[in-house]
């Protein structure tokens, strides 16, 4: 472990390897490279101090270096204890960007690193947050509430909350008033994923959001591409790398049929699995049925299926009573943001056998075993390397544009949650067409007038559902 300088990575000697993979990824990320070309000279993020909490992968390295090329100072940590690619972290650290991320880091270290990404060498404060899941944002807001005298740290509901609250208390003792100062310095946050967006909307509805936020997740070029097509490729990759199990002919259950569930079902179906879906939402359930999937109750298939994947963003989707009834060597994994979709805490008193990193065999009293991937955390990042570079280019181009928007136009946004305007969503899509050899049909003036749009777009209303 390297800790001499302003970074913490597993092995700084991996930097050259990471740099080679970053170079390859850049050729697959036309949106980010176009941002560098368009905005590099103007440096619209000059003066921005961005705290980033997002999976420290090769693709994220390209995002980080894009933000730096646009003038920002950046400090970075991963938003998941298993998702870091150590060679990517090393390459970014070697390039001079403070990064604090190790694949397989402890929860204690995770929250220490989250604190470190707010601790600038000159004692200054962050003025922007780029978040994935909302942990960096919540860290500051919880600490500020504690400083205001609210009793928010007394009753943790999980092991992770115990560790988070302990870290907040350490910072409160070391730097009284710091959380409030840091909160007040933030110009805005851009949020990557469904779970973090839900947190922001809850804060906004209660009048507790202290700065503007852009919901990057619900940009069409994020949710309909990263969430769907990204999962379509990376889910099966993670299961294969973790288990070497052949999926053709197996029965797989996908819990949830939102965008992530749709991509996951397609991923497993494409690998030859016989896919069944569970859903609480009647609209999503109808979509699943009309896409050809049997929509079932988990209780009715728990003893017969081979693979179980959670995609919901909710908690306790697969519970201990479900896992007790699973067949021997059933595979259980999650591709939603947090680890509480599967009731992993209830498994801790059983016999665990670690097979290899992020693959555990858990034995129940009656003798049946399950294969748990990434301890219930994101298996596509824990057991594999996440989504491909091309689809992440679309997501991260949205992040870059959102950071520019909030940082350069602070007076135009209230303390609410916003979505990037349609013309920027279409711009992100355009930036990725040439790479695929796509040719767009040009509307005539008459055609455009007939449907009430400009020949140059936007081509759809804000309420259009893609």
From Swiss-Prot:
Catalysis: reaction(s): S-adenosyl-L-homocysteine + H2O = L-homocysteine + adenosine
GO terms for cellular component: cytosol
Cofactor remark from the record: Binds 1 NAD(+) per subunit.
Pfam family, one: AdoHcyase_NAD
UniProt cross-references to Gene3D superfamilies, sorted A to Z: Adenosylhomocysteinase-like, NAD(P)-binding Rossmann-like Domain
SUPFAM superfamilies associated with the record: Formate/glycerate dehydrogenase catalytic domain-like, NAD(P)-binding Rossmann-fold domains
Protein residues bound to NAD(+): 193-195, 227, 256-261, 279, 314, 335-337, 380
Location (main, coarse): cytoplasm
Sequence positions that bind substrate: 57, 132, 192, 222, 226
EC number: 3.13.2.1
Necessary cofactors: NAD(+)
UniProt keyword Cytoplasm, yes or no: yes
Protein localization: Cytoplasm
SMART domains per the UniProt record, alphabetical: AdoHcyase (SM00996), AdoHcyase_NAD (SM00997)
Record-stated family: Belongs to the adenosylhomocysteinase family.
Protein name as annotated: Adenosylhomocysteinase
Species, as recorded: Rhizobium etli (strain CIAT 652)
């Amino acid at each position: 472990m390297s800790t001499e300088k302003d970074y913490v990575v597993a092995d700084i000697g991996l930097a050259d390897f990471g740099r080679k993979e970053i170079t390859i990824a850049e050729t697959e990320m036309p949106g980010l490279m176009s941002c560098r070309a368009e905005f590099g000279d103007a440096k619209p993020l000059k003066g921005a101090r961005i705290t980033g909490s997002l999976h420290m992968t090769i693709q994220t390295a390209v995002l980080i270096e894009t933000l730096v090329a646009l003038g920002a100072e950046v400090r970075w940590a991963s938003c998941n204890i298993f998702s870091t690619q150590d060679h990517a972290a090393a390459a970014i650290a070697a390039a001079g960007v403070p990064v604090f991320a190790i694949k397989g880091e402890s929860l204690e270290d995770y929250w220490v690193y989250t604190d470190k990404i707010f601790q600038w060498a000159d004692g200054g404060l962050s003025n922007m947050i780029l978040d994935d899941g909302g942990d960096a944002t919540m860290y500051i807001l919880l600490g500020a509430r504690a400083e205001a005298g609210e009793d928010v740290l007394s009753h943790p509901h999980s092991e992770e909350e115990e560790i988070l609250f302990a870290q907040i208390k350490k910072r409160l003792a070391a730097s009284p008033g710091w959380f409030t100062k840091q909160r007040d310095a933030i110009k805005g946050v851009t949020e990557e994923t469904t779970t973090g967006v839900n947190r922001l909307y809850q804060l906004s509805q209660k009048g507790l959001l202290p700065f503007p936020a852009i919901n990057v997740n619900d940009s069409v070029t994020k949710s309909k591409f990263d969430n769907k097509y990204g999962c379509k490729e990376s889910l099966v990759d993670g299961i294969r790398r973790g288990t070497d199990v052949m999926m053709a002919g197996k029965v797989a259950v996908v819990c949830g049929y939102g965008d992530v569930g749709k991509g996951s079902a397609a991923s497993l179906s494409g690998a030859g699995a016989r896919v069944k879906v569970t859903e609480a939402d009647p609209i999503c359930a109808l979509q699943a049925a009309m896409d050809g999937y049997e929509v079932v109750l988990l209780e009715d298939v728990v003893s017969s299926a081979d693979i179980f994947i959670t995609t919901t963003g909710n908690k306790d989707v697969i519970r201990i009573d479900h896992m007790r009834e699973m067949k021997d060597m059933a595979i259980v994994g999650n591709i939603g943001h947090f680890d509480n979709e599967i009731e992993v805490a209830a498994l801790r008193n059983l016999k665990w056998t670690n097979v290899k990193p992020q693959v555990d065999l858990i034995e129940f009293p009656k003798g049946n075993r399950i294969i748990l991937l990434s301890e219930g955390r994101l298996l596509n990042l824990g057991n594999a390397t996440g989504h491909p570079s091309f689809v992440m280019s679309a997501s991260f181009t949205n992040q870059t544009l959102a950071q520019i928007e909030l940082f350069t136009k602070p007076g135009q946004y209230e303390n609410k949650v916003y979505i990037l305007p349609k013309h920027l969503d279409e711009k992100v899509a355009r930036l990725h067409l040439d790479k695929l050899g796509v040719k767009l049909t040009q509307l005539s003036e008459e055609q455009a007038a007939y449907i009430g749009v400009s020949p140059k777009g936007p081509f759809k209303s804000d309420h259009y559902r893609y």
